[in-house]
């Protein structure tokens, strides 16, 4: 846990009122926190995020649950890639949608684009990716993300409806130095980014995450 985080928690406990610390926050999250997240994303990745693009959640799991509900109705499908985090199944099933899984490219665990394009049918309203990936640890390259975006844009135009890209990113910062780890939203405009500080700052018990759109 970062030392600055612990010191700030102690400072807040000593200086803030119990109501401010433990009362209900606004439904979208505390404004100053949303603003800080937006500023950080814009500074690090060069995209024009504003407070209005950020929705605070209880970790990435809640962020994903909200994202799935936002882009599906019963009978729709979400397409993801093997191997994947097993809890995606119940999260999607609760919406009445179906999780379809593209088999892995066993040579390097990047995307098998032939299989992906075949399975990206009209009932798919969102594609779900997780990079760096749990459980494989694979990181999608910039070339992989660009080709993914190209196919999704082509299919969205063909079907006449949006296809959203839901990017599950709790491991975003946990990569080796020099690894090509692109920020997904830079390559596809209809990206819904789901993030958690549980891994990057080792704060799983705090349940702090967000959706960025």
Protein language model regions, located:
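Active-site phosphate-binding strand-loop segment of PLP-dependent enzymes
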Residues: 106-177
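Short acidic capping loops at alpha-helix termini that bridge into adjacent secondary structure
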Residues: 49-54, 75-77, 123, 161-162, ...
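A short helix-loop-beta submotif of the ANL/AMP-binding
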Residues: 93-100
């Amino acid at each position: 846990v970062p030392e600055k985080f612990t010191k700030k928690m102690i400072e807040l406990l000593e200086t803030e009122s119990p109501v401010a610390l433990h009362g209900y926050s606004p439904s979208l999250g505390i404004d100053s926190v949303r603003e800080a997240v937006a500023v950080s994303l814009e500074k690090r990745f060069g995209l024009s995020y504003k407070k209005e693009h950020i929705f605070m959640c209880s970790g990435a799991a809640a962020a994903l649950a909200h994202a799935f509900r936002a882009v599906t109705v019963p009978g729709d499908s979400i397409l993801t890639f093997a191997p994947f985090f097993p809890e995606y199944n119940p999260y999607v099933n609760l919406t009445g949608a179906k999780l379809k899984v593209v088999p892995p490219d066993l040579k390097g665990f990047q995307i098998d684009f032939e299989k992906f394009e075949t399975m990206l049918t009209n009932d798919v309203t969102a594609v779900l990716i997780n990079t760096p990936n749990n459980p494989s640890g694979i990181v999608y390259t910039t070339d992989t993300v660009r080709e993914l975006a190209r196919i999704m844009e082509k299919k969205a135009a063909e079907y006449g409806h949006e296809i959203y890209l839901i990017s599950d990113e709790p491991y975003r910062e946990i990569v080796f130095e020099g690894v090509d780890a692109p920020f997904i939203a830079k390559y596809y405009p209809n990206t819904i980014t789901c993030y958690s500080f549980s891994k990057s700052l080792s704060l799983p018990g705090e349940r702090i995450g967000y959706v960025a759109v």
